[in-house]
Structures are given as structure tokens and as C-alpha cells.
Amino acid sequence: MLYHEKFDVIVVGGGHAGTEAALASARTGQSTLLLTHNIDTLGQMSCNPAIGGIGKGHLVKEVDAMGGLMAQAIDHAGIQFRTLNASKGPAVRATRAQADRALYKAFVRNVLENTPNLTLFQQSVDDLIVEQDQVVGVVTQMGLKFRANAVVLTVGTFLGGKIHIGMESSSGGRAGDPPSIALADRLRDLPFRVDRLKTGTPPRIDARSVDFSELEVQHGDNPTPVFSFMGNRAQQPRQIPCYITHTNENTHDVIRANLDRSPMYAGVIEGIGPRYCPSIEDKVMRFADKNSHQIFIEPEGLTTHELYPNGISTSLPFDVQVKIVHSMKGFENAHIVRPGYAIEYDFFDPRDLKLTYETKFIKGLFFAGQINGTTGYEEAAAQGLMAGLNASLFTQGKEGWSPRRDQAYMGVLIDDLSTMGTKEPYRMFTSRAEYRLLLREDNADIRLTEKSRELGLVDDARWTRFNEKMENMEKERQRLKETWINPKSEDIDQLNQILKTPMSREASGEDLLRRPEMTYSQLTSLDRFGPALEDQQASEQVEIQVKYDGYIQRQQDEIEKSLRHENTKLPADIDYSKVKGLSNEVVLKLTTAKPDSIGIASRISGITPAAISILLVYLKKHGLLKKGEEA
């Protein structure tokens, strides 16, 4: 049966990638259908109850700067907020929050149900309708056909999903949910490169069975940080602590004695797991010299007794899981309410994607989230937003858009995936970005909101707030530049008490703020340089921009040099075997990768600077270089 309404964009999957994709498409005015196997699981946190962290918090802020949902959802559902790396420089500071799962899911669903241009429908998708190498719709489990100009697949761990607990395995997309077998089979028939990955989750614990007096308490920050540029602390629910315990030699002995019952070590699981979130059995074997591992005990919400022991993800049999839990301090009598498990699933080589997340083989088909080999809610949300935006642009006949590596962590993410691919679940870190001093959490809106407004993603309220902040920053910097003090001023003693060395010559407010010992709040506490801005986001920007001005300018200069050929287009029909001087290896890699630009080609493993020079000469010879791209 053909559904009566044709949509502009169909999004398959209602997780963190799917919700952002559907909302981005709908926000840009496209009629959008979100298909999910279960409407009650929209926005569900399948693994740990937390958002943010190093590199990840940066992605959340970028999603927010572009009008996305994740930051606002966690501001309304976060039960403990912390700034990580608070003592370090602003480039690597990151926000992280524990979430109340129920509050988070409820907030997401409420937004989805009340978004114009967005229709929700509960059905699993079994097939794609493809005509002349272009997707034109989907077929659901009960044979319903929905037609659209573009389809975004955000299917998480559901493609060919298999759950492992010990040597027992069963089909599943996650505990309690069926996998997508028919869709996985259909995608394997298409010309994509496919492989398997693995992830896992720990057993959940009943808090009433834990002796908290034996645990170390970990409180959140006070005052709490806020994720969204539109958020405020009044939106946050009641704050509660987390706790810390440790594994010990007894724990490790239990694990080592039962490795023959681990599906990972017995060769049952073929997929590679996440390097930066390994299972407890992996940690014990890889770090054999360590006799203890820190385990973070995270509450799952304000109205549940469930605890998430972050650090003991496992696929060992349930009886072994019980022994592991009971071996830890404070957990001697702990009751497990849900067993831990590993899940193996299909992913598709992201080198088969364009920078817009559109697949290279099927027009109008976009992939986002774990299907691309990533791990993490934040990475999924960032991909979902970009895929949804570009699906919308595709349906409008407009050129796609993706930020560059120097503009956003989102740009680093898709560039890494589409040029290098991945053999293990990909996680974002600040260390992956060359220009991280420019890609800070605090300036995500300055980097992305104006472009997002142009693309139709940002509403009037956010745009008004953004312009207000920019105006406040500009006025405050001008005020500090124009306010001077000299060593003979009457109020010089007040200033010298703050400075490490007394003033010897006249200085402006900006000159003083550049000094490492001077903060904006200290400076504006002085009568001459007060009052401070009430807009805290703007004052934070003023301080960072003034203090790091030289370093920021240096990175900007580096970027301008590297961008000279970054966007030089490579024709889609170029025959690299006809480019004289390229080695057979380079020809093969370029033909396989089909890079869109010189910048992308330069980051493919094995493509040398000499090969790039040969390509530029070829492009110039054939009149394919624009003015300013020569040499």
C-alpha cells in the first residue's frame, strides 16, 4: 500500500542522530517523516546516562549553535553538571552532565511532537525504494510504502544486531528491541563496503543494595555550567552526586579465570569494540600491570533506584557479572537489575560518503550515526543534524554544506570519517582537531550560528540573542580599549595590589586584561574599569579573545595558508590513470576514495604532497583551476 502523502525527507530511526536529522529537516521547512520501530523509545539513552565530555561537549555546543536539540534536552534533564579540564586552557575545557533518562526522553519526545512540518510514524523499515540509482522512498515491515525525495538512515546498532551474554547470543538492536535484519540484508545488496563493530554496556545495580558509606562522593560544580546558549540554570532539575569505587585484584582474578567464557576472547564476537570505552575484561588484559580500575557510579535518574556503573561494561556470563560486582567495595551485597551485554552490528565504510553525509552510490540517501562507524550520543547528534540539513538542501535542489576542519568539530568528524574511514568505533577528542584553540565550546555560536541562520536552521529567538551577545562583546572591547590608567593616577594603588609587578607606564583596560594574573572580574571590580557586563557569555568571550589574541591570530594565519587549495574541486569524472606522474598506488587510492576536493585528497593516507602538486598542474593545464588557486 502506498501512503497517500509524499514527504520531502524521510528519517529512519529515532535515536540521537534521527531526532536531530528530523528536526533539522523540519526546521528548514521540509515536510519530514520520522519512522521509528517504537515511538516510546524516541530519544532513548541506550547506554550511559550522560551527555558531553572532552571533545563531545564541543559537539553538543555546535549542535546547539545550529539550533539543534541535545543541549536544551540535557539542560532540562541534567542531574549533575561539571566542567572537565576547568584548570586548563579554554580550548580543552568541556561540559559534561549526568542525565535523568526519563526526563531526557520526555523532553525530546515533546519537542518532536510539537515541531511543525514533522510527522511521526511507528513502523520498522525493511526496504528502500531505489530508481535509477536514486532513493525515492522506503517500504515498512507491514508493506506500507512512503515516498520522499531524500532518505536519512540513522539506525544505530539495529542493523543485523546480535546481543551477547557469555556464550549465549540472540538477535536484537538493544536489550528488549528487535534488530533490523531485512534492512541490513537490503543494504548489503547495494555497492557499499560493510563490516561489523561491537559495543557493550554494564550491568545495572539497585541503589538500595549498595553501601554508599564505602564509596567516594563526587559532587557536581556549583554554580552549575549550562549547555545551551539559550539555556539557564533555572531549567535544571534537582542536582545529586555521583560516586566512585574501584575494581581490585579479586575482581581481576574472577575475570581472568572466566575468559574462556567471554564471547570476545572465545572468538564468537568478530566486531571491534571502542578503544576508549573498553569492556572490563579488555581493560584487565590490556593493562595487566594495573591492579585497580576506577568505576564511576552514576544515578540513572531522580525517580529510579537504578545505578549505572561506568567502567565495567562486559559480555561475560551473568554468574560472572554477579561475582565482578560483588568483588567491588560497597557492592558486596549489590543486586543486579539488568545484566550487562555486548552488541555486534553492521556499519558501512564512511569513505563511501560525501562530506554532506550523502552516499556516493545512491543519490538522496544519507547515513548518520553508528551506521558510519562512530560511537557516542554526541557524535550521532552532530551527524544527524548535518545529514538532515543536507537532505533538506538536496530536496530543494540546493548545494550541500559542511563545515571545514577549521570551522567546527563537526567538520573534523566528517572529514576524518570520509577520508580515512575507521576500523573501530570512532570517538571525538579535542586532540583530533588541528585548530582547537579556535574550536572552543564557548565560541561555537560565533563560529556557526550566522551560517545556520542563512541555512534556515536558527529561529528568531536564538538569532536575536546571538546578535545581542555580539553587540555586547563589541561594545565592551571598545570600552576597555578606550579606558586608560597611568602610574600617576589616584587609583593606581588599587590596581597594583592585583598586578605581580607595579605599573610603570600608561595602559588601557585591554592591555591589563592581557596580563596572565588579571581576570575580567578583577579588572571590572576596579572603579575605573567597571561595571562588568551582565551578559556572562559576552564577558567570557571578551576575556578569552583579549588574552589569547596573539595565539588566535597565529592559527588564523595557518588556516589561510592551508585553505589556498582546500576547496579546489576535483571533477567527479576525472580519470586518475590519465594524470601523468601519479603512481599506481595513488591512482588506486584516489579512484577508490573519489575525493571531492584537493583538501580531501591531501588527507587520504598515502597521498603525498608531490601527488597533490601533480594534480594541481593537471587541473591548471585543463583549465580547471579558478583564479587565485594557481601555484
Swiss-Prot record:
GO terms for biological process: tRNA methylation; tRNA wobble uridine modification. Keywords: Cytoplasm, FAD, Flavoprotein, NAD, tRNA processing. The keyword NAD applies. Homodimer. Heterotetramer of two MnmE and two MnmG subunits. InterPro entries: FAD/NAD-bd_sf, GIDA_C_N, MnmG, MnmG-rel, MnmG-rel_CS, MnmG_C, MnmG_C_subdom, MnmG_C_subdom_sf. Gene3D superfamilies: FAD/NAD(P)-binding domain, GidA associated domain, C-terminal subdomain, tRNA uridine 5-carboxymethylaminomethyl modification enzyme MnmG/GidA. It comes from Vibrio atlanticus (strain LGP32) (Vibrio splendidus (strain Mel32)). PANTHER family: GLUCOSE INHIBITED DIVISION PROTEIN A, PROTEIN MTO1 HOMOLOG, MITOCHONDRIAL. GO terms for molecular function: flavin adenine dinucleotide binding. This is tRNA uridine 5-carboxymethylaminomethyl modification enzyme MnmG. One of its GO terms (cellular component) is cytosol. FAD binds at residues 13-18, 125, 180, 370.
